Structure formats: structure tokens, C-alpha cells
Amino acid sequence: MSSASSQRGSGRLARLRTRDFDRIHRQPARRERSRRFQVLARPNGLERARWGISVKAKLGNAVVRNRVKRRLREMLRAAALPAGWDFVVQPRDARVATADFAELALELRALLGKTLAEEGG
């Protein structure tokens, strides 16, 4: 692994495997929604966060769906996801592909924080 990739923190984040992805969909420990996203979360007992992105076909054609996934991947890389949790992010609106990136990132970070804030209450 190059030093550049380790500096970005890629060692802390990992994508979910299919069986873990399915487990979160069947039994999410936490679920929060905003206007443009839904986040499912579940403790994983590991020392790193894992994430997945689920984009439904109704959001648009392959070009739109792939653009949404690229943008979400970058937002998740920039977000400080806490270790010990699995996250699945689902966009709820095709406008995620064209909306202002900074605004979307702020909304997603707030939603992730809200998802984990349930722990205290």
C-alpha cells in the first residue's frame, strides 16, 4: 500500500461485503432519513468503519446512478466515520447527482451524526 493511500485513511474505512450489506438491510440497528438520503447503521465489533452505497434503478439510468455513487464515495471518504460501525447510504432523490457537493456533504455528515446520536438517548 502506498504512503499516499495510508495518509488518506483508507486503512480505517472498508467497503461492506455482500453478506454484511444484506444483514444491515434486514436488521438495521439504526435508521435515519433526511430529504435526500437514508442511512442504515449497525455495530460491527471491528476497529474500523465499513460502508456501502445502495442506489436504486428508479433514480435514473446507469450514468446517473454511477455519478451518484462516485459522489457518495467521496463524501464518505471525507466524513469521519467512527470505528466499530457499518453504514449503508441510500440516496432518495436523483438530484443528488447534480446538487451542490458541499451542501450534500454537509447534509450527509449531519445525518450520520444524527444516526449515531441515538446511542445517548
Where are the language model's segments positioned?
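Positively charged, solvent-exposed patches that mediate nucleic-acid binding
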Residues: 1-121
